[in-house]
Each structure stands twice: as structure tokens, then as C-alpha cells.
Amino acid sequence: MARWKRETGGSDVAPRRRGVLATGFSWLLVIAWAAVIFSMSAQQSTGLSSGFTGQVREVAVGFLALLGLAPDSFSVICHFAEYLVFGALLANAFSCRLGLGKSFLLALVCASVYGAGDEFHQYFVPTRMCDPLDWLTDTLGAALGSFACVLALRRRR
């Protein structure tokens, strides 16, 4: 039993050994989502207020106002949501070959490091800034996303 736990990252649940195709697809989704995050961060804040993105923002801010939330909370919610998805995708990809405990921790660390790098990247984008609170929000979103993914995978196994 101790050997089993050691091989599965301390989990009583065996790692799901998926095929090469499923594993590759899981990592492709991670890379695609990381590219979405990077491209959103590379846009100037004025670019996020126009076109389709601006229309989505207007509707969302209107909805937040109905809930009694400040329009500034839209940015926080977006950061949280994009990293919630990122954390879940990372945990799923890591779980192809690792136990659930290690998958959760690696997903959280990778998403947090990527979030820190993303905030640093925004420092060089005109009209954007590097905000440690955004990084914290990213990390919290990734924690919830990876935890939810691990719980769902645990139920499946």
C-alpha cells in the first residue's frame, strides 16, 4: 500500500493512464488557453473596450450593476474566471500521468507562475499595468479550478 501511494503521488486513487491522443489533446487545450490569456493581456486596455469585447463588457457590467456590484469587479471576475479554466485544464492534463494530489499541486504552481509572468508582461503593454492583486486573483481562480477538476476526476475513478 505504501508503494502504491508513493507511485500515485500520495493518493489512494490510481492515476488515469490515458492514451497518447487524449493526453496530447489535454495539453493542446492547455496551450490554447494559455495563448488566449496571453493575447488578452497583450491588448491595450482601450482595445478591450471596443468591438465585440466591449459589447460583452457592457452587458456584463450592466448585469453586475443589477447584482449591486461595482463595475470595477468585472476585471476581477474575468481574471478569476480565466484562471479557473486554466487551473482545471492543467489539473486534467497532469492527471493523465500523475496522481490527483500531484496534479492539483502542479496545476496550481504552474498557473500561479504563468499568472505572475502574465502580470509582468502587462507591465510592457501600453495602458496596462502589473498588479499583484490580479496575480493573487489568478492564483485563487486556478486553485478553485484545479481543485474542482481533481474532485470531478476522483468521482470518475
Question: Where are the model-predicted features located?
Answer:
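Bulky hydrophobic segments
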Residues: 2-124, 132-133, 139, 143-157
